[in-house]
Amino acid sequence: MVRTPAYSHTISHHHPIVAFEDVRVPAANLVGAEGDGMAFAYEWFRFERLMVAARCLGAADRLTAEMTAFAAVRQAGGLPISQHGLVAGMLADSLTELFAARAMTYETARAIDQGADVKVSHAQCSMAKLYCSEMAGRVADRAVQVFGGRGYMRENVAERFFRELRVERIWEGTSEIQRMIIARQMTKRGPALLA
């Protein structure tokens, strides 16, 4: 290991930098056949992308609950801010997007459990990861707005999730990569098969 960079987020993942020089792996220690490593990586990506979607569901659920509770007690103009149209819209949009993301993620997991075509489920995992990670970012942004100045303070759940959810759109394939995977499968298989 060359080094392990420190990260400021609280997620317990670290990405050590590893360098190999003149390494030989005996044939008995190979996992699968030589040159098949990407097949293992693709299979891993399929499930990891679904896990990213699930993590984002949990974060969005927590944020939606926290900002709804706060908006019910925080007063502005003699009313709870949840009764002001623009704040009510942010709450409603967050819950609606969470509902859609949850349905997408659960349906994708169900299809995999029932033996769906690997290429189709790979694209669907990419769709779930793309939608859920982008959705969680929008929910976090709304939560910071609902909490106001408190939402920007380090000890506030909205600030922490706003900062930490950003990486969900990057690791296991950026949102741009997910869009390329989805579009490629759409052109090969047709959108009806993927949706």
Predicted regions, residues:
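DHp/HisKA dimerization-phosphoacceptor four-helix bundle of two-component histidine kinases
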Residues: 55, 86-96, 127-134
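FAD-binding core of flavoproteins
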Residues: 1-66, 79, 175-180, 184-195
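C-terminal helix-coil-helix/basic helical segment that borders enzyme active sites and/or dimer interfaces
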Residues: 68-80, 95-131, 144-152
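Alpha-helix capping/hinge segments and adjacent helical runs
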Residues: 123-195
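Alpha-helical membrane and juxtamembrane elements of multi-pass inner-membrane transport
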Residues: 38-39, 85-92, 119-122, 126, ...
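Conserved catalytic-core motifs characterized by acidic clusters
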Residues: 4-6, 28-45, 69-84, 111, ...
